[in-house]
A protein has these predicted regions:
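Short amphipathic alpha-helix used as the core "switch/output" element in two-component signaling
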Residues: 78-90
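Hydrophobic/aromatic residues positioned on beta-strands within the core alpha/beta folds
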Residues: 97-98
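Active-site residues of response regulator receiver
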Residues: 68-70
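Non-catalytic signal-transmission and effector/linker regions of two-component phosphorelay proteins
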Residues: 1-20, 27, 85, 113, ...
Length: 145
């Protein structure tokens, strides 16, 4: 009896078409861009400051945002999260990335998912494939199960 076929790329839920990366560490930003493009995300934009990210959000709405919450130009990414919140129920999914997940206020964490640094890119890609949850706190520490 043949084994069941392995899951193929076409069996997986789709990734968002457009992802905005807000990350002040250029090496991490470029590595994320490369990983997401390699996984099939068509349009990846990197912003290194809060102002760049706010401008990008005003220009075009992404499907998802990977947001480093401790940016160098401001101490947090809350201004970006607050703007996304005003976009309503069709707002982009937010993945908050941080080395200190316990420091994210619960009301902010409810707007998206919290991904503790360091994380591997496959974890992020798997998370971006999941359907967007509304009103549920999703805290990810390490690998998705």
């Amino acid at each position: 009896m043949p084994d069941s076929p392995a899951t193929t790329k076409t069996d997986l839920p789709p990734l968002p078409d457009r992802v905005l990366i807000v990350e002040d560490d250029a090496i991490i930003g470029l590595a994320l861009e490369d990983a997401l493009a390699g996984a099939g995300v068509r349009n990846v934009e990197i912003c290194t400051t809060t102002e760049q990210a706010l401008d990008a959000l005003r220009r075009e709405r992404p499907d998802a945002i990977v947001l480093d919450v401790h940016l160098a130009d401001r101490d947090d990414g809350w201004a970006i999260a607050e703007l996304v919140k005003t976009l309503g129920p069709d707002s982009p999914r937010i993945v908050f990335s941080t080395g200190a997940p316990q420091d994210i206020p619960e009301e902010v964490a409810e707007m998206g998912c919290v991904l503790a640094k360091p994380y591997d890119f496959e974890t992020l890609i798997d998370l971006l494939r999941e359907p967007k949850r509304r009103g549920i706190i999703s805290r990810l520490r390490g690998r998705l199960r």
